Amino acid sequence: MTGSNMSDALANAVCQRCQARFSPAERIVNSNGELYHEHCFVCAQCFRPFPEGLFYEFEGRKYCEHDFQMLFAPCCGSCGEFIIGRVIKAMNNNWHPGCFRCELCDVELADLGFVKNAGRHLCRPCHNREKAKGLGKYICQRCHLVIDEQPLMFRSDAYHPDHFNCTHCGKELTAEARELKGELYCLPCHDKMGVPICGACRRPIEGRVVNALGKQWHVEHFVCAKCEKPFLGHRHYEKKGLAYCETHYNQLFGDVCYNCSHVIEGDVVSALNKAWCVSCFSCSTCNSKLTLKNKFVEFDMKPVCKRCYEKFPLELKKRLKKLSELTSRKAQPKATDLNSA
């Protein structure tokens, strides 16, 4: 376009805002082909010039950044700031792409997608883990899905068995697969190797073996059924197919002393329908030691030596004697009257 044609075009042009013509020496603002007087190129809300020429356009009207945010920009559900540019709409809220993150692992979800879980937005792996936790199941560490059947445990992690093949024969593995020296084998191939299997963890035993309860065990896995501490070569006691350390075997199955309430180790004194340590069986009045050969009487469910008994008031001794006679009479079997029939 020649200079004369340009002048003619400007002479016929009008301001986009006020529709007035331009004077020949006037400065004109051109915004995407739209012409404005310099004083007309202002924010449609506050009527002020755009700071540094930056403006936002909405429905044919131009706004400064502040007014555009106040009028139209959504607030981020995470940081609370206005969102300019891409908006993520999810969970009945608006988000900056960088603010919309998994509530458990903090990974960005904008381009990954998310799953709603108990009012939370989670990435799919975290959702699967939470789902598995609620069902009491494992999550496969390869595909990150719930393992509905029995998992294959490999290097302390759970997997779907069909992700692996036997190192020896190449067959797809099942949950019965065995790990040996960092490799996985199907059960038949593993059994051919003659490696013992631990009765606790069901894994091969490559070092020292403990033979007990008709099974083989890793040393650290052969433990007391009560306290779960390894025996580590110490003596164990067996009961109904389980192994116990001496302390807990005595606590569970041994006699408890009526006096000290401890499990009785060694000889047991049985008297007054109770069990006593040899050292605890004594006169409850003078504390002199008693044996079953000594004469004693029962008073307040405890033994009293003959010497202390003789010091009791006469009335008390009569009552004790009568009580003893009644007790012995009840203990005797009743005679049958043959003439009563």
UniProtKB/Swiss-Prot annotation:
Keywords: Cell junction, Cell membrane, Disease variant, LIM domain, Limb-girdle muscular dystrophy, Membrane, Metal-binding, Nucleus, Phosphoprotein, Repeat, Zinc. It is linked to Muscular dystrophy, autosomal recessive, with cardiomyopathy and triangular tongue: An autosomal recessive muscular dystrophy characterized by childhood-onset of muscle weakness progressing to a severe quadriparesis. Additionally, patients have biventricular cardiac dysfunction due to dilated cardiomyopathy, and macroglossia with a small tip resulting in a triangular tongue. The gene is LIMS2. This is LIM and senescent cell antigen-like-containing domain protein 2. GO terms for biological process: cell-cell adhesion; cell-cell junction organization; cholangiocyte proliferation; integrin-mediated signaling pathway; negative regulation of apoptotic process; negative regulation of cholangiocyte proliferation; negative regulation of hepatocyte proliferation; negative regulation of neural precursor cell proliferation. Changing P97L: In MDRCMTT; uncertain significance. GO terms for molecular function: metal ion binding. Interacts with TGFB1I1. Interacts with integrin-linked protein kinase 1 (ILK) via the first LIM domain, and in competition with LIMS1. Part of the heterotrimeric IPP complex composed of integrin-linked kinase (ILK), LIMS1 or LIMS2, and PARVA. Changing L323P: In MDRCMTT; uncertain significance. The modification Phosphothreonine is found at T327. It comes from the Eukaryota. Changing N92K: In MDRCMTT; uncertain significance. It is found in: Nucleus; Cell junction, Focal adhesion; Cell membrane. Its main location: nucleus. It is a peripheral membrane protein.
